UniProtKB/Swiss-Prot annotation:
It comes from Leishmania donovani. GTP binds at G180, D181, E182, G183, K184, G185, K186, G210, H211, T212, R569, G697, N698, G699. Its main location: cytoplasm. The keyword Membrane does not apply. GO terms for molecular function: adenylosuccinate synthase activity; GTP binding; magnesium ion binding. It catalyses: IMP + L-aspartate + GTP = N(6)-(1,2-dicarboxyethyl)-AMP + GDP + phosphate + 2 H(+). The active site is at D181 (proton acceptor), H211 (proton donor). The gene is ADSS. This is Adenylosuccinate synthetase. Substrate binds at A563, V564, T565, K566, K567, P568, R569. InterPro entries: Adenylosuccin_syn_GTP-bd, Adenylosuccinate_synth_dom1, Adenylosuccinate_synth_dom2, Adenylosuccinate_synth_dom3, Adenylosuccinate_synthetase, P-loop_NTPase.
């Protein structure tokens, strides 16, 4: 059995996972009755809501219904935990009104302090307190004291750092290392500026990715499928054949920006034989997806058509109408069948579309609604594509992208593959399979989609993460998040504008409460166990669980919302458990964006391990390993899949901030020594993930990057 480098002890029956619970920890402290495993309240490390609330059914828990009594662990390791799980359970809810910013209930209490329609609460409930009290006596992990030595990091130049890596490779991939939205654009821009980097390509996924770029004049462009290098003269940008594209949306939302700005893209942008996202794919997404589970860009349905070989590609639009018509008729059967099964009329679909757009954010475009209204839908699509694509003089040039990229590398040029989404959002990662996108957005997926010869051409991956405020948008498990992933959407909070502006608006006070009260023993190494207490934050609008307060305050203060959907992202701690797997699979290089945010924090938290805990004592079998209460999952251990991760809670190492020595580009002198807090944070991340940190972001501008000497 291999030994981990920091000497973790193992459960004899399950290599790599130790157990932190002993019978004495829960003896005499019975947990209160609970709903079916998986229900969760809206708070940091989210215990199921109290009995008087109601619960939302979730299919994930059906896979592990066997009740398991608490058993004495074979190995005891010292740590503390509280429960963290998304809304699961089998109980159906009573009728409880959803949260409304300025409403009061019959008792006069603000509904922000009531149990919401999802079963979530804004305050800390009694069950949370009970569970925390039952577990608080567990002792700290020794790893909380690592690393023993803090490295000193010296700044170096772009040419002596990133450019040396570029020059040693043929294919450079910039890939997200968490759940998307990591700030990859800045690294993409830095690579694209290298003189030998002539080709920038998007090779898979679709318009569900989004990024904001600026040209030299400071003009803002929001691209979804278009590569970021479009604004750089002399660069060729490609959209490869494994991408999926709604060509109407692409013209109306992306190409129009170039036209309006007077940018000639004729020799800069080339499109391969992409799979086409049709209006019915987007409607299938709307009709078949749970709230907050999709960008409504038709990704899962179009990838289904692609795999079934039923859809259309771009070449079909540019050839005879009869073939196009036949393929559309066949592929549309899925949409028409769903309407029949759900007993929906065209008018019902139109109504749902308009409801989705009712807050002013256009999630369902007009032409998609027009398709839903059309009597002869196939003819509507044939005419739509004929007018908006085939006969559109502004539609970009088409080419064999695979051939062009291959030829460029043979000429000695460098190819940049711009990764959409991220490693953990890849459909090829089984750990989060149910809540991922539909393409393989790992670095391996990028290289495969590019069809570049991986034995002939040297490739390298630049992984990108973000801290503080690592974030995820959409549903799914994320143990290091401040609240459940569906916390906002469950209360019909679709955009940042839907958050009451006065709620948890004082970020300074919220983060101070988190680190002072949420980790009451943070300055006592013998007692700090890395588990966040379910304390409350109060302002003039009410009381909030500290996780809720941090989630709201972080989203507002950092402007954390999806570039495509505008959904508030759920922030949390930098997660070394997940990051370790990313670097072990995709290579050691890591760049951390937005680190200047740390200038405003008293402390910065880093998740170094998880602890599995389910209040009902239920166990989860993942890949033949049975996770039970008290099991510790360290960085470097196998990462379990979501049924277990829903019950995993972060063990957080705290690092002192650097308020007195800010690193923001506007405040820092170039080549000034980095503050000790920054060095300790970077040392901690490198220690637990085996990564090599190439650079850190310290401002909003493209060149606000501090490159680190290796």
């Amino acid at each position: 059995m291999p030994v981990r480098r920091y000497g973790g002890r193992y459960n004899n029956s399950s290599p790599g996972v130790s157990n932190a619970l002993s019978p004495s920890t829960t003896a005499g402290r019975p947990l209160s009755p609970s709903p079916a495993a998986g229900s969760k309240l809206a708070s940091t490390h989210h215990d199921p809501v109290p009995q008087e609330a109601y619960y939302v059914n979730d299919e994930a828990d059906a896979r592990h219904q066997q009740q398991a009594p608490f058993r004495e662990p074979s190995v005891e390791v010292e740590v503390e935990m509280i429960d963290d799980e998304p809304p699961h359970g089998s109980q159906k809810p009573l009728s409880v009104a959803p949260y409304t910013a300025n409403a009061s209930n019959s008792s006069g209490r603000s509904k922000r302090n009531a149990i919401t329609a999802s079963g979530y609460t804004f305050y800390t409930n009694e069950r949370q307190k009970t569970v925390y009290e039952a577990l608080r006596s567990l002792r700290p992990l020794a790893e909380l004291q690592e690393p023993r030595r803090v490295k000193e990091y010296a700044e170096t130049s772009l040419k002596d750092s990133l450019y040396r890596i570029i020059e040693a490779h043929d294919v450079i991939m910039v890939a997200g290392a968490f759940f998307g939205d990591e700030g990859k654009g800045k690294t993409v821009d830095a690579v694209a500026h290298h003189p030998l980097c002539t080709c920038i390509a998007r090779v898979n996924s679709g318009e569900n990715a989004g990024h904001t770029v600026y040209d030299k004049a400071g003009r803002k462009f929001v691209f979804n499928l278009a590569p970021s290098g479009l604004l750089l003269p002399g660069k060729r940008n490609y959209i490869g054949p494994e991408c999926v594209m709604d060509p109407v949306s692409f013209m109306e939302k992306e190409v129009i920006q170039l036209i309006d700005a007077g940018i000639d893209y004729r020799d800069r942008l080339f499109i391969g034989n992409v799979c086409i996202v049709t209006p019915y794919h987007k409607l299938l997404d709307l009709l078949g997806s749970a709230a907050n589970s999709s960008t409504l860009k038709g990704m899962a349905p179009v990838h289904g058509s692609k795999v079934m070989k039923r859809g259309i590609r771009l070449d079909h639009i540019f050839n005879d109408d009869e073939t196009l018509r036949k393929r559309l008729e066949k592929d549309m059967d899925t949409y028409l069948g769903l309407l029949k099964v759900k007993n929906l009329s065209d008018a019902d679909v139109v109504r749902l579309c308009r409801e989705e757009n009712s807050d002013g954010v256009v999630r369902v475009p007009d032409y998609v609604i027009a398709f839903a209204q059309a009597k002869v839908k196939v003819e509507f699509l044939v005419k739509l594509y004929r007018d908006r694509v085939r006969h559109n003089p502004d539609f970009p040039a088409r080419c064999d992208v695979t051939y062009e990229l291959h030829a460029a590398v043979l000429r000695g040029e460098k190819v940049l593959l711009e990764g959409p989404q991220s490693y953990w959002l890849s459909n090829a990662r089984t750990k989060f399979w149910e809540s991922t996108t539909s393409a393989d957005t790992t670095a391996a997926g990028l290289l495969a989609a590019s069809q570049l010869n991986f034995q002939k051409f040297k490739s390298v991956v630049l992984n990108v993460h973000k801290a503080p405020g690592s974030s995820r948008v959409g549903i799914g498990a994320c143990p290091s998040s401040f609240v459940p992933q569906d916390y906002f959407s469950a209360q019909n909070i679709k955009t940042l504008r839907d958050l009451p502006s006065e709620t948890c608006a004082n970020f300074e006070a919220v983060q101070r409460t988190l680190f002072r009260d949420g980790f009451p023993h943070s300055n006592d190494k013998a007692r700090h166990n890395g588990i966040m207490a379910p304390v409350e934050y109060s302002d003039e609008t009410g009381k909030y669980n500290i996780g809720v307060a941090m989630a709201i305050a972080s989203a507002q203060h950092h402007g954390e919302c999806g570039a495509v959907t505008k959904k508030p992202r759920v922030c949390g701690f930098f997660d070394c458990v997940l990051q370790h797997e990313v670097n072990s699979i995709q290579g050691p290089y890591l760049t951390i964006s937005a680190l200047d945010r740390g200038d405003e924090y008293d402390k910065v938290g880093v998740t170094i391990a998880y602890v599995y805990y389910n209040p009902e004592g239920k166990q989860v079998d993942v890949n033949g390993h049975v996770y039970k209460n008290g099991d510790i999952i360290r960085a470097g251990d196998p990462v379990p899949s979501e049924p277990a991760l829903y019950h995993c809670h972060p063990i957080v190492k705290l690092i002192d901030g650097w308020r007195d020595n800010p690193i923001a580009a506007a405040k820092r002198r170039r080549n000034a020594p980095l503050p000790r807090g920054v060095c300790e944070l970077l040392s901690t991340i490198e220690y637990f993930t085996n990564c090599k940190i190439l650079s850190i972001g310290n401002g909003p501008n493209g060149d606000d990057i501090i490159y680190l000497r290796q």
